[in-house]
């Protein structure tokens, strides 16, 4: 029984190391680091308007999303 448990533990450890070393779980779509706010308060536009404001303020490479959030509505800019 202990021999089987050790084998399973070893295989699980190898799989974890494989996934970590090849960055299989790393997503290019991850966009959750807060960059800053943009536009007036309260922000009356849509998410598309918010993204356009963020790109105009912070430029395109760092900005990956703009979302209208909060009460009152704010335009929040995010980078990956």
Curated annotation (Swiss-Prot):
<protein>
    <recommendedName>
        <fullName>Defensin-like protein 207</fullName>
    </recommendedName>
</protein>
<feature type="disulfide bond">
    <location>
        <begin position="38"/>
        <end position="64"/>
    </location>
</feature>
<feature type="disulfide bond">
    <location>
        <begin position="50"/>
        <end position="75"/>
    </location>
</feature>
<dbReference type="GO" id="GO:0005576">
    <property type="term" value="C:extracellular region"/>
</dbReference>
<keyword id="KW-0732">Signal</keyword>
<comment type="similarity">
    <text>Belongs to the DEFL family.</text>
</comment>
<keyword id="KW-1015">Disulfide bond</keyword>
<keyword id="KW-0295">Fungicide</keyword>
<keyword id="KW-0964">Secreted</keyword>
<dbReference type="GO" id="GO:0050832">
    <property type="term" value="P:defense response to fungus"/>
</dbReference>
<feature type="disulfide bond">
    <location>
        <begin position="54"/>
        <end position="77"/>
    </location>
</feature>
<dbReference type="GO" id="GO:0031640">
    <property type="term" value="P:killing of cells of another organism"/>
</dbReference>
<keyword id="KW-0611">Plant defense</keyword>
<feature type="signal peptide">
    <location>
        <begin position="1"/>
        <end position="29"/>
    </location>
</feature>
<keyword id="KW-0929">Antimicrobial</keyword>
